[in-house]
Amino acid sequence: DAIKESAFTILGKPILFKYDMWTDDASSHEPEEVQCGFVPKDEKDADIQFEYDKDLGKTFLTVNAYLWNVYQEDLIRILQRDDGYKNVSVEMWLIEYDESTKEEKGYITVNQFVYNGITILGSSVTEACEGADMQVVKFSYDDYQKAQLQFEARLNNSINQESDEDSFLIQ
């Protein structure tokens, strides 16, 4: 229930990335992370959905987001090399939680939280929540141009004028 109640807080949040030159890959949660994209503020553009994974026994939030090509050459190259797939981890503030379950279950029960961002992880970094990943769904130039035109039309009508210039769609 907490994931569904907090889902709307992902809207407008940044996608974060730090390049690790030693592994030629993304890093992890680091103070030097930079914003490389965003989740749209508009619910329709973000297309928030919930998918239950039978094998993992978990419900995942899925959302559309955009990554910028400009200034992110390393990330683009990494995504092309890795077939557009990377594990991710979310950054969040816990609002309401129960620490009494930590000893018995090995984790605290989170009842309410707010998303702060999504971090792209390197291949050598294990995601905190197994199955948390991203997949580039639009990487071709033609698909990018179509998505860009649709997105720009919506974005130009928004109050906060984010730019999707030189970006592509991920989910």
Q: Model-derived features: where do they sit?
A:
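Acidic, proline-/serine-/threonine-rich low-complexity intrinsically disordered repeat tracts
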Residues: 161-164
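C-terminal assembly interfaces
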Residues: 170-171
